[in-house]
């Protein structure tokens, strides 16, 4: 059994670690709430653009934007959004499993796959696999700036318009709640058809006049909409990261508390044994006299 002094040192070390994990838990909780607010505030913008795009595309059936046209899929682009930092449980591992499963499915169909990577963890992982990477970006911090994300998104969209990619998907961790984050893959382009239920029951009740003309507006809005979808995915992934980190740090804090309790019992036993030995020595010395 270790001596009482060694056990006291271990207890002190675990207590220091517990203070750090508790602080990280509280910081993650604060950041998660801020990210949730940012996530909620960006949704109405995306919803409004969805409605306008649906209205214009249905009213001008003679004009088909490339982002709305389905074509034979020979090349797929996947935008994978991961975290820049660790200590967030199995968040990235589950995301990578989802992405690799889809990549495997595409390759089995003889479809070429190109990746766009956002987040240092994803960049490091997929570079090690030797997959084709078309664009990458990291160092977003806790408040991602839309302008910084537009570059990597536009590279994927330009490749689609040039015919180098036939479909683009985005993979990220969808924020369900504090305890649940789900890795998902969603189609970006060609844009899935929007039904009236997803746009609101009054989406077709008004006739609008668009200037300079519907086609020019549609060209601009589609790009803005897709950029907003990428930004929304990044923000949701960030909220998932903070939630996962908060849960992981809480578990670490609780485990540290349990370890301290166990060490305290061991320390008490060691101290009791030491006192017993000292008493035995005193009694033995007195008996010898």
Swiss-Prot record:
**UniProt keyword list:** ATP synthesis, Cell inner membrane, Cell membrane, CF(1), Hydrogen ion transport, Ion transport, Membrane, Transport
Which cellular compartments is it found in? Cell inner membrane
Principal localization reads membrane
Q: Name one GO molecular function term.
A: proton-transporting ATP synthase activity, rotational mechanism
A GO CC annotation given for this chain: proton-transporting ATP synthase complex
Q: How does it sit in the membrane?
A: Peripheral membrane protein
What biological-process terms (Gene Ontology) are attached?
A: proton motive force-driven plasma membrane ATP synthesis
What InterPro entries does the database record attribute to this sequence? ATP_synth_F1_ATPase_gsu, ATP_synth_F1_gsu, ATP_synth_F1_gsu_CS
* Superkingdom of the organism of origin: Bacteria
Please report which protein family the annotation says this sequence is part of: Belongs to the ATPase gamma chain family.
Q: What does this protein do?
A: Produces ATP from ADP in the presence of a proton gradient across the membrane. The gamma chain is believed to be important in regulating ATPase activity and the flow of protons through the CF(0) complex.
Q: Its quaternary structure? A: F-type ATPases have 2 components, CF(1) - the catalytic core - and CF(0) - the membrane proton channel. CF(1) has five subunits: alpha(3), beta(3), gamma(1), delta(1), epsilon(1). CF(0) has three main subunits: a, b and c.
Q: What is this protein called?
A: ATP synthase gamma chain
Task: Tell me what organism the protein belongs to.
Answer: Histophilus somni (strain 2336)
Q: What is the lineage of its organism?
A: Bacteria, Pseudomonadati, Pseudomonadota, Gammaproteobacteria, Pasteurellales
